[in-house]
A protein has these predicted regions:
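Intrinsically disordered, low-complexity and often Lys/Arg-enriched segments
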Residues: 1-18, 213-215
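Short beta-edge/loop segments at beta->alpha junctions of small alpha/beta modules
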Residues: 10-95
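Nucleic-acid-binding surface
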Residues: 12, 78-215
Length: 215
């Protein structure tokens, strides 16, 4: 009886788990079908159902040599040259989100152009990844982990313009913003509580007061 139960369990396990693993020709196809444009080894392990890291990296190296995948950073791979550079920027150091001048410029709060991608993370660092300069700005852990004012678009975390405004003032005491008309001040004061910082509260009230007086 015990032997029969064991045989049944093995049959069930193989049909349920092993049969669902990709066949040899489908490994690359699974990556190409994914909504991600940038993959870590951990991402690939989950997509392939493979726990052996050596097997994964060897297979990835084979695809890179064949020109079917692109290595964009140590431990990070892309489908091709058209990968999302913002996705890459938030995958190198995590947790992180796109913010500061990248958002402020896109949203019309600041008019100066920056070629760098600015990212809020847990460290200060400037790097170049596959020709793209990325500036990481250190934020306090409690602030970084609070998702108030953070939106996720196509798998990439983005600060809202109000969050980017506050983040910049949080790390830079004095800063010139070209256009505060586009900010929702109710949202600014809502997000402000995340920082628990008296100096920042005073600074934001000053910017708001000056803004109101010029209207």
């Amino acid at each position: 009886m015990l032997l029969l139960l064991l045989k049944w369990y093995l049959k069930y396990y193989i049909s349920t788990y092993m049969d669902n693993r990709p066949s040899k020709g489908n490994f690359l196809e699974i990556l190409l079908r994914s909504s991600k444009t940038v993959f870590s080894v951990q991402d690939v392990a989950l997509l392939w159902g493979e726990s052996e890291s050596t097997t994964i990296t060897n297979r990835l190296k084979k695809y890179i040599r064949a020109g079917k995948l692109l290595r964009v950073r140590h431990g990070l791979y892309a489908k091709d040259e058209n990968y999302d550079r913002y996705e890459l920027a938030t995958r190198i150091y995590t947790p992180s989100y796109i913010g500061f001048e990248t958002v402020l410029t896109r949203e019309g709060v600041s008019f100066q152009y920056y070629g760098n991608i600015f990212v809020a993370s847990y460290l200060n660092r400037e790097i170049e990844a596959n020709g793209q300069k990325i500036t990481y700005v250190r934020m306090k852990r409690s602030v970084l982990s609070d998702t108030t004012g953070i939106n996720h678009v196509n798998g990439v975390a983005w600060a809202t313009k109000e969050r980017a405004f506050l983040d910049r003032l949080y790390v830079t005491k004095e800063y010139h913003f070209d256009n505060l008309n586009v900010l929702d001040w109710d949202k600014v004061f809502e997000i402000l509580t995340v920082y628990e910082n008296k100096r920042l509260e005073k600074q934001v009230k000053k910017y708001h007061r000056n803004f109101v007086n010029t209207q």
